[in-house]
Amino acid sequence: LIVFLVWLPSGARALLIAALQAQRVLVGMIFLFALIALSLLWTAGQRLDTWVFLLINLRGYHPKWLDHVVWLATQVGNMVTAFLLAGLFFVLNYRSLAVEVIFGTLTLWLLVETIKALTDRARPFLALEGTRIIGWRERGRSFPSGHTAQTFFLMTLLSHRFQLDVGGTAALYAVAFLVGFTRMYVGAHYPRDVIGGAVLGSVWGVLAMLVDPYWLGLRF
């Protein structure tokens, strides 16, 4: 949050601070993320994490065609996808939204990488023998899931910006949950990495919503 505030222009920062004072739900979400991060110290939590991860990654039906579909689906959470989406919005004359997507993506990436360095949690394929790896071996640490955080950030922001109804919002979040599931399926993340990423991405999306009037007021 501090990183986000430092990067924001002064006008947007003042707007955000004022809005935060009335956002108890957002504060609760930040607190929830902190609890998830602290739970990494819980031994029983690691055992549960491992059990659920192996259930999704190793057990059950895993045909080759499904592996390919899941690998493609997980790319929705890639930063490249976000930049391509921002480019599309720019071409379609949603320029403030394009800038918001790029700014939010970059600051979220910086935050995720900082938290990963602090928590220093190894990827499951480094700790669990026999883990199935679909695609390439992801670099870096495991908590939180950057792909999941990125997807939840985008879906939260887009749902707000386009004022989607319940059905549209549910469809966007269904995609976000799917990306979270794929991160375990491809062997890149534990369940708590995904849950933490979902909460963090949602927080970033809400923060983007709060400063949305600032971006709408700029000319691009």
Residue ranges and their predicted role:
Residues 128-220:
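Membrane-embedded catalytic cores of phosphoryl/pyrophosphoryl-handling enzymes
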Residues 102-114, 199-207:
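Hydrophobic, lipid-facing residues on alpha-helical transmembrane segments of integral membrane proteins
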Residues 39-40, 105-116, 175-179, 183:
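Alpha-helical transmembrane segments of multi-pass membrane proteins
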Residues 26, 70, 96-104, 167-171, ...:
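Alpha-helical transmembrane segments of integral membrane proteins
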Residues 53, 57, 90, 112-120, ...:
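Membrane-water interface at transmembrane helix exits
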Residues 4-81, 116-138:
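N-terminal transmembrane-helix/juxtamembrane module of multi-pass inner/ER membrane proteins
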Residues 32, 85-111:
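Interfacial segments of alpha-helical transmembrane regions
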Residues 4-14, 88-94, 161, 210-212:
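Structural signal for the C-terminal ends of transmembrane alpha-helices
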